[in-house]
């Protein structure tokens, strides 16, 4: 997860005032028009009188302090779209939407629900021998195109190493918002990593050991994805993900009949409740969703933010990072932070959710970040802030930017970056950061099991906060889950049988896991443990 500096305040007014409209340049590349500062003035005057004093003051300060930054210009990624003839398959959403069938009641209905006519899916069969990533394993890459909105989402699919005809299919999503899921592929749970010499190294603990995995770069303008428009909230991104899965399973019906699971980490704590709810809202679908998994997620800020001070001040199982004075200062700031989040929860408006995010992140998160310690692992210093404290990302980025790699994958943008700070900014300043997406989890639990797991050395989405929000969640099984005790989680499937890897509690469709000795990215720090609980979860244990 990537947090913002105050230098990005300048864009708050722009994002809250008006969605970006896109003009088409003569070369076919989308270019955003210049935004007029008067839009900010007019919109501010319209809403300011209705805001609480503290929030109104925040926006007045924005206008005064950052006027010189207005207006701004936002440009899309440079890209060259490949003709359809260069792809092995092109699936038209309009064709799927046009199919009608007769139901058991004799009434005609569409075979598959959802707005799909504006979407296409382009598919390329990847030759593993050209890249050296999981040789012998069937792979596909390509783009989901929203032709109406000029959005193009990149994906890379790996078939299971074990039994692809029967093993489940899993979607993996990294967070940010704005970070590529290829980070998860090459740094965490995918079939290979890239060493400092840009050599491909196989990962024996890959999650495709017993499952087929789709890595998706979303929202648009993340990783190899691109667009002439933008997505700046989680709900809009959910429509794209539903379309991708629908068209993918239509092209590959051999996977559609198998169990499907949606998984991710960090800001995926926002994404997954929305995406799962979107899929489950459709009665007639070819997506066989069976469960959801969220690792070290941000899901319920109101319940999670009070746990930052304990985690940073020695109450999360690791030595304190902050001194007592700073810890007291965080305590003193918490009441106002929570008041702002509560107001955001009540209105879900950017005009109140943005101040909540800016104040809380400054008062509650910034003290830790100023120490130079890794916000994703309280045990280590941040080696390289530009690479999110993980220098390994530099090699991954260099490898993915090789022309031979991009050609083999059918990539249409000119370059790859692991995280797009512009996407992070847009989500934050549209108020998405603090919104109460946890409220969707009870309806999801009515239909499928949900696993919340957390590496216990992470600060930024720490295990204390994830335990707190799962215990506090109001759903029919709330009391039994909250009363359930954490029990030892042990390895059962290999030579290390009996080794403690964490703690687990479960009741009904809800499960929480604390994974020992892991930071924000559990599969990176504890690859054996992550594959252990992942395989057991897919196998139906705990639900």
UniProtKB/Swiss-Prot annotation:
Q: Propeptide-annotated positions?
A: 18-124
Show the InterPro entries listed in the entry: AB_hydrolase_fold, Peptidase_S10, Ser_caboxypep_ser_AS
- Which terms under GO biological process does the entry name? proteolysis
- The top EC class is hydrolase
Catalyzed reactions per annotation: Release of a C-terminal amino acid with broad specificity
List localization entries.
Vacuole
Pfam families reported for this sequence: Peptidase_S10
Name the Gene3D superfamilies on file. 1.10.287.410, alpha/beta hydrolase
> Is the keyword Protease in the record?
yes
Q: Which residues form the active site?
A: 266, 458, 520
Give EC number(s), comma-separated: 3.4.16.5
GO cellular component term of the entry, any: fungal-type vacuole
S-S bridge residues? 179-419, 313-327, 337-360, 344-353, 382-389
PROSITE patterns, per database record: CARBOXYPEPT_SER_SER (PS00131)
Q: Which UniProt keywords apply?
A: Carboxypeptidase, Disulfide bond, Glycoprotein, Hydrolase, Protease, Signal, Vacuole, Zymogen
- Give the positions annotated as glycosylation sites: 210, 509
Which Gene Ontology molecular-function terms are recorded?
A: serine-type carboxypeptidase activity
The keyword Plastid is assigned to this record: no
Q: Where is the signal peptide, in residue numbers?
A: 1-17
**Family stated for the protein in its record:** Belongs to the peptidase S10 family.
Function text: Vacuolar carboxypeptidase involved in degradation of small peptides. Digests preferentially peptides containing an aliphatic or hydrophobic residue in P1' position, as well as methionine, leucine or phenylalanine in P1 position of ester substrate.
Q: What is this protein called?
A: Carboxypeptidase Y homolog A
Please name the source species: Trichophyton verrucosum (strain HKI 0517)
Gene behind this protein = cpyA
């Amino acid at each position: 997860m990537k947090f913002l500096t105050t230098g990005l305040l300048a864009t708050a007014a722009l994002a809250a005032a008006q969605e970006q409209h896109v003009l088409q340049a003569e070369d076919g590349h989308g270019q955003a028009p210049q935004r007029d500062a008067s839009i900010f003035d007019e919109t501010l005057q319209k809403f300011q009188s209705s805001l609480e004093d503290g929030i109104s003051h925040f926006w007045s300060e924005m206008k005064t302090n950052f006027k010189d930054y207005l207006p701004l210009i936002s440009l899309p990624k440079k890209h060259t779209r490949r003709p359809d003839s260069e792809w092995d398959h092109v699936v038209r959403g309009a064709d799927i939407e046009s199919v009608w069938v007769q139901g058991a009641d004799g009434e005609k209905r569409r075979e598959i629900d959802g707005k799909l006519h504006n979407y296409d899916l382009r598919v390329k069969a990847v030759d593993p021998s050209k890249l050296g990533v999981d040789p012998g394993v069937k792979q596909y890459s390509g783009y989901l195109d929203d032709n109406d909105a000029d959005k193009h989402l990149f994906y890379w699919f790996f078939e299971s190493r074990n039994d692809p005809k029967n093993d489940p299919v899993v979607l993996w999503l990294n967070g940010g918002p704005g970070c590529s899921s290829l980070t998860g592929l090459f740094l965490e749970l995918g079939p290979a990593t890239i060493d400092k010499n840009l050599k491909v190294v196989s990962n024996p603990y890959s999650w495709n050991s017993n499952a087929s995995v789709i890595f998706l770069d979303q929202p648009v303008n993340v990783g190899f994805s691109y667009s002439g428009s933008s997505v700046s909230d989680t709900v809009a991104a959910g429509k794209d993900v539903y379309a991708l899965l629908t068209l993918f399973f239509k092209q590959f019906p051999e996977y559609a009949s198998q169990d499907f699971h949606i998984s991710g980490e960090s800001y995926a704590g926002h994404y997954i409740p929305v995406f799962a709810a979107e899929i489950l809202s459709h009665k007639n679908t070819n997506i066989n969703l069976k469960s959801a998994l969220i690792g070290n997620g941000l899901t319920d800020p109101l319940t999670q933010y009070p746990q930052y001070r304990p985690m940073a001040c020695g109450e999360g199982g690791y030595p304190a990072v902050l001194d007592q004075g700073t810890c007291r200062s965080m305590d003193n700031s918490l009441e106002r932070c929570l008041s702002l989040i509560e107001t955001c929860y009540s209105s879900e408006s950017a005009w109140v959710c943005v101040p909540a995010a800016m104040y809380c992140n400054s008062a509650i998160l910034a003290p830790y970040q100023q120490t130079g310690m890794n916000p994703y692992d309280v045990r280590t210093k941040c080696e390289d802030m530009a690479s999110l404290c993980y220098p390994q990302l530099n090699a991954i980025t260099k490898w993915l930017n090789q022309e031979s790699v991009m050609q083999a994958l059918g990539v249409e943008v000119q370059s790859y970056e692991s995280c797009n700070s512009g996407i992070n900014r847009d989500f934050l300043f549209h108020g998405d950061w603090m919104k109460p997406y946890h409220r969707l989890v009870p309806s999801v639990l009515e239909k499928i099991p949900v696993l919340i797991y957390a590496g216990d050395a992470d600060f930024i989405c720490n295990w204390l906060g994830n335990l707190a929000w799962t215990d506090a969640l109001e759903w029919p099984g709330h009391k039994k889950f909250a009363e359930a005790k954490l029990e030892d989680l042990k390895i059962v499937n290999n030579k290390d049988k009996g080794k403690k890897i964490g703690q687990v509690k479960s009741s009904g469709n809800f499960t929480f896991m604390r994974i020992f000795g892991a930071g924000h990215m559990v599969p990176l720090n504890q690859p054996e443990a992550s594959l252990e609980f992942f395989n057991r979860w897919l196998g139906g244990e705990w639900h």
